[in-house]
Curated annotation (Swiss-Prot):
The keyword Lyase does not apply. It holds the Pfam family Ribosomal_L7Ae. Keywords: Cytoplasm, Ribonucleoprotein, Ribosomal protein. The gene is RPL8B. GO terms for biological process: maturation of LSU-rRNA. It is found in: Cytoplasm. This is Large ribosomal subunit protein eL8B. It comes from Candida albicans (strain SC5314 / ATCC MYA-2876). Component of the large ribosomal subunit. Mature ribosomes consist of a small (40S) and a large (60S) subunit. The 40S subunit contains about 32 different proteins and 1 molecule of RNA (18S). The 60S subunit contains 45 different proteins and 3 molecules of RNA (25S, 5.8S and 5S). Its main location: cytoplasm. Residues 1-36 are annotated as: Disordered.
Amino acid sequence: MAPKGKKVAPAPLATKSAKSSESKNPLFESTPKNFGIGQSIQPKRNLSRFVKWPEYVRLQRQKKILSLRLKVPPSIAQFSQTLDKNTAAQAFKLLNKYRPETSAEKKERLTKEAAAIAEGKTAKDVSPKPVVVKYGLNHVVSLIENKKAKLVLIANDVDPIELVVFLPALCKKMGVPYAIVKGKARLGTLVHKKTSAVAALTEVNSADEAELSKLISTINANYIEKYEENRKHWGGGIMGSKANDKIAKKAKAAAAAVSTSN
C-alpha cells in the first residue's frame, strides 16, 4: 500500500484572513416563498398556451399538429418539399419580368388600340401580343395538357389541397417542368391578385431563354427526376416530446423485464 502524501507546510509569514462575520438583524425574518396553490404570488411565466385564441388560430394550430402526427399519404406529403430559397428567388425574379398588365396599363393599351383602329390601322400594329405569366387553375391545366407550359409553379398551401393534388402527376405525365413553392399569396402578388394556386410560363423573350433552361434543369433535378422516389415516402408520424418520453419509458421497462427474466 502506497504511503499517504504528507501535508504541505504553510507559507512563512502567511497571515490568516479574518472571516468577516456580519451581524444579522434579528428584526428581519427570512420568509421563503411557497409557490403552492393559494400561497405566494406565482413568478411570471410564458402562459401563451393557456390563452383562448380565436377560432381561426386554433384551426391553424390543430391542422399543423395533425399534419405532423398523422400518417400523410405521399401525394399530399410531397407538398411539404418546397423549392429551396435561392432557386425560388431566381424563379420569381424571372417571372416578375412577365407579370400581367395592371388595370391602368390595360386602359392605356386599349386607348392606343382604339386610336389606331380609328386611323385605319390594326390593333397589332400598336401593341404586339404580350408575353405574360398565365394563371388560373383551369387555364393552366389546359396549357399543361396541351404541352404549351414551359414551367409551372404550384403553391404548397392551397386549401382545399384537392384542387392541386393531381398537378404534379399531370406535369410528370406530360413532361412539363414543375416546382412546389411556398405561399399562394406570393404567387398572387405575381399576378396582381390576393392569392393564386398556380402560375405558368408558356414562352419567354430570347434574352431569357438561357436563364429559363438553367432554371428548368435545376428544378427538374429536385422534382421530376425524384418523382418516383417521392411517391414512396409517407409524411407525418412525428410525435410530440411527451409521447416520445412515454414510448422511451415503456421500452426501458420492457428491456428491464427481459434482462431480469434472463
